[in-house]
Amino acid sequence: MLLEMCVFCSGFMSFKMINKIKLTALCFSLSLGVLTVSAQESAIKFSSKTNSDKSVELSYEKQDPGTYTVLLRFRELTNTDASSEQDITIKGYSGNLLTLKPQNTGQGIGYSYASTYIRGKFEPKYDANFIYTLPYKSGVKAMVSESGFVGARYFGNTTPDDWKVYRFYTKVEDTVTAVRKGIVVDIKDLHENNVSDGVAYTSKSNDMIIEHADGTLATYRGFKKGSFVVEVGQTVFPGTALGLNSKNNSNSGFNISLMLTYLKSKEIDRSRTIQNSKSLYGFITPHFATAENADVILESRKEYNASIPAEVFKKELTKKEMKKHGVK
């Protein structure tokens, strides 16, 4: 997830690896510190144009089609009745952000602003009982473990009340699949999968974010480097192959983690530290369809067999998409 302010950004969370028990429970943390980056690294670029009627158009271009919440704070704003604070939802690769219209058409508009943005639609309406599939092909058996919150263990801040992240283990390397229809909005494929003993935690993982139609986000972490078979901007469906899971240390099985979130706050505080940070995202406890049960909340350290029933496809797919996937 990404949070940026003008030409500076804050990572949403960093993946941590805890090697404590045989079936390793891998943990996540939320990192909300602001980091300075160059304009070339910015996920969204803003531009402005003054029209012949003295109106000003603010536009955006970005690197993925996903939804962002943009916060504009005008330091200077003259000859227009626009609000000095604007919260705007954007999606797609480019578009109009805001148009400022002059009060006096014979004069130009004076303005300067700071922009902050974070991935996701603010407070989306979602179904808490939505049924997801396991992140593997039908018939694959997976051991489930709940991941702890590494911040509470290592950095002193408290675990979010709604914290829920699952890790799915397989005995052999296997294909990771989408748990729901959505659009791929981010892929990080940077790190070799080095199997090491005695590692307390690491932020080095290969990740993917998929945005769903209701504004929720699925973050998959722990892919084998170079194994991704989908691209940013691609629509995926339940069971669509995404890449391969990986092994984190010699004591763990091959695995992938899954976290379902939504943007619940836009109260961004640059003074936050690891110790006092609070998540801007809410966490969803998902319901899953498995071979054993059509609607179940998973229990840690239990095995489940993956299944993709037709009802899962019928929930979101169009008639054309269902026909393509052989769903009647």
Residue ranges and their predicted role:
Residues 1-44, 60:
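Bacterial Sec-dependent N-terminal signal peptides
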Residues 216-239:
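Short histidine-centered loop motifs in beta-beta connectors
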Residues 89-203, 299-328:
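Surface-exposed, glycine-biased beta-strand/turn segments
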Residues 54-58:
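Structural beta-strand segments of beta-rich domains
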Residues 132, 234, 254-328:
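Acidic, glycine-rich catalytic/binding loops that coordinate metals and/or anionic ligands
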Residues 176, 182-185, 233-245:
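A structural signal for short beta-strand/turn segments enriched in small hydrophobics and glycine
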